[in-house]
């Protein structure tokens, strides 16, 4: 099932619990909450940069500035701007970069 559909099914009461992504904007958009995985069942999710090796010299500086720059909560808020407020990813990311 599409992850966005599972969030909507959870919100509507069709499901009681789902496995999702901690940075999904739909958590905020649909006023849901994240349970703590105190038994560490799910492995940690780490976002990584992926690029072609011939572009690394151009991108390494930008990647360095972005590394560890966004918390889970902030990423969720940014995703909410796209998922909940229907803004474009380019607009949201552009504002975030300018705010740094």
Describe the predicted segments one by one.
Residues 36-40, 53-55, 67-70:
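Short, low-complexity, polar/charged sequence segments that are solvent-exposed and flexible
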Residues 1-8:
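Short helix-initiation/N-cap motifs at beta->coil->alpha
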């Amino acid at each position: 099932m599409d992850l966005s559909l599972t969030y909507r099914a959870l919100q509507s009461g069709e499901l009681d619990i789902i496995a999702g992504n901690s940075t999904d904007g739909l958590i905020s958009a649909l006023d849901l909450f994240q349970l703590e995985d105190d038994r560490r069942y799910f492995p940690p999710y780490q976002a990584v940069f992926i690029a072609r090796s011939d572009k690394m010299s151009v991108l390494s500086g930008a990647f360095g500035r972005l590394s560890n720059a966004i918390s889970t909560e902030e990423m969720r808020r940014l995703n909410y701007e796209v998922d909940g407020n229907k803004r474009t990813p380019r607009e949201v990311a552009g504002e975030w970069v300018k705010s740094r």
